[in-house]
Amino acid sequence: MIQLNEPLTHVRTKPILISLEFESPGRKTIDSVATESVLNSVVKINTFSSKPNICYPWQNKPQKKSKGSGFVIPGKMIITNAHVVANHILVLVIKRGSPKKYKAEVKAIGRECDLAILVIESKEFWEDMNPLELGDMPFLQESVNVIGYPTGGENISVTKGVVSRIESMDYAHGAINLPAIQTDAAMNPGNSGGPVCIGNKVVGVAFQTLGHSNNIGCLIPAPVVKHFITGVEKTGQYVGFCSLNLSYQHMDAQTRSHFKMNSEMTGILIYNINQHSDALNILKKYDVILSIDGVAIENDGTVIIPNRERTRLDDLVSLKQLGETILLKILREGKMHEFNITLRPVQRLVPAGQIDNNPSYYIFAGFVFVPLRKQHFKGSNGEQIVVISEVLADVINVEYYMYKHLKVNSVNKVKVENLKHLCELIEKCCTKDLRLELGDGRVIILDYQFAKSSTSLILERHRVPWAMSKDLMTDQSTTCSSTRLY
């Protein structure tokens, strides 16, 4: 059964909201009949994938095959969902009405927005393939067609419904809250990555359903897709979604009075600014944000867009491009101020459930060190939280066998900055004892030379080919005696 927000892969400074590209309610509605040209631009995607083993990062889990959908866009590219090609080994694309499979490469993948771009070298594939045009955010009750290759058959499927809701929601495959569209059109596993059209224009991409409800399918809106594509076209890679990187609270009448707001003012109260935010040296704790780019902020952190539904203030920021600025109107100690803030993408210490990247790890004396796989903000200096994910049993570590999932604070009293730094500190240790201080206060003491000589035997006994991941091996400054194959 598809659970709440589960992806649909088979087998599992202008005072307007520029980024959402809202049109006036007078826009002419095109009849939502799916034409042959649209259907021919929708493809079936077969993916062979293998997830990394989190506890044993040098291993992969058994291979599996899954099915999804995609569609052709200008530039000889194919749009699909990130979860359709996650951890891919091989991606094959099949055109409508054809048995031939074409090998595809993943050009870019955006986990947060659950989107990916595929490219195919074969000239034959692109014959008679017409790219689909991305439209705008639809309006409530507009009719839409969901097109793709869901479970239940091999031929293309078209289902019809209406736009039932537009609001921000958590993307199941990502780690961010973004605008989304809900529809009552039937959506099933395999629809993921397929276009949702009004006439010949794509207004969304199918990506997940609400499992504990009836007939609620979720779409990635065209403005989010455009943001993703624009970033890839400008930089050649996924650039992410911008954020002010600050925390705020709603304001009731008592709070507004305390912070000297008059009866006509509305806004939200900043209570924390991330140390890596571009706003750190501009905004202050307990500043009140009254508006963003001229759009008033309500006391509950929402904004009102003319002729549209109320939405979160974060949506005024998230779809801006890297390096754009926004104008903030601030109330500080009863006085009004205006500041321009340059926006940067949200950076995470380690994106939850990394995809398409071999996990980083380092093994010494049987202790398996990895970066924490949980959402955290990341500093420009590459700071990470390093934890012990597993202890490969040996006489040297038997007393520490239960010391798993614990943060490593320091090595020989030097604070650990990231996994690479921990590796360097251990490999270049020049003291008799190696001292590891953990996050809960416990300490690990190892005879360094004995531990170093034991590492080779431990790796061989546990059938581990390498003492560290390739990304650590490529660092020439790290001189590791245990990087050879055992």
UniProtKB/Swiss-Prot annotation:
Keywords per UniProt: Hydrolase, Protease, Serine protease
Family according to the record: Belongs to the peptidase S1C family.
Xref: Gene3D superfamilies: 2.30.42.10, 2.40.10.120, 3.20.190.20
Enzyme class at the top of the EC tree: hydrolase
Protein name, per record: Putative protease Do-like 13
An annotated GO BP: proteolysis
Region entry Serine protease, spans: 44-229
Originating species: Arabidopsis thaliana
PDZ domain segment(s): 241-334
Gene Ontology MF terms: serine-type endopeptidase activity
InterPro entries membership: DEGP_PDZ, DEGP_PDZ_sf, PDZ, PDZ_sf, Peptidase_S1_PA, Peptidase_S1C
